[in-house]
């Protein structure tokens, strides 16, 4: 039907053709827009898998990954700090050592160290964030309790027990020999008192020859400041060769009558080793009647 009614057939055909042409242009424009949108989305989400197999991608990735894993391994194996003896992993027992600074000496055969893994090469003592604490408050729960392997020193007065002869001299010597110095402790095992039983070595400038590595347990035995560990259970020497060496050092100190062996020959019947002293104290305490508590 012509519209308007008075229009001729040719005019109606021209108008229809214009409308059709307009619709075609809109459809073409819409199709182009949709195609461009799809192309953009596909370009964004497309993954060029071939790029991941190129040398320029693989080599830096391998270097970065290896560096990260290597740094993690070195830190875990060599630079991890143990805050106490309980934290020491079994992989250290009879295999590895701890480097640290002695912060206190509790008795003639035990002391505490602040573990400094890596030593000065790792920045301990000179980097601002690797300073060794000095106050008791700062050191609380941050030191490893070390028990010297292979020896038994005279007992100081504690837990209500009297002081054993020559205990104070042994404690004073060990304090002057180790306090504030860096030592290396070869860990054998933990003991029942949450200490690490270890063979400990120190270097001192004033010793002769200077800076020679000294076995602390051996030095105490030579001076008659301790006896060879006599208990049958829990004895640690670091091997049979070290046990023979310690017994020989004790024999020489006894022969010369130095330290706690001074009155041994004249008073053998009353002379008491640290092991005998602890056994006697244990028997006396066991024989005492239990203390009744007031209700």
Swiss-Prot record:
Key words, A-Z: Calcium, Endonuclease, Hydrolase, Membrane, Metal-binding, Mitochondrion, Nuclease, Transmembrane, Transmembrane helix
Residue positions binding Ca(2+): 152
PROSITE patterns in alphabetical order: TNASE_3
Localization per record: Mitochondrion; Membrane
EC number: 3.1.-.-
Active-site residue list: 147, 155, 195
Lineage top rank: taxon: Eukaryota
Segments of skewed composition (Basic and acidic residues): 17-27
Keyword Membrane: yes
Ranges where the TNase-like domain occurs: 96-263
Topology of the protein relative to the lipid bilayer: Single-pass membrane protein
InterPro entries: SNase_OB-fold_sf (IPR035437), Staphylococal_nuclease_OB-fold (IPR016071)
Gene3D superfamilies: 2.40.50.90
Annotated region (Disordered), positions in chain: 1-35
GO molecular function: endonuclease activity; metal ion binding
Name of the protein: Probable endonuclease lcl3
Name of the gene: lcl3
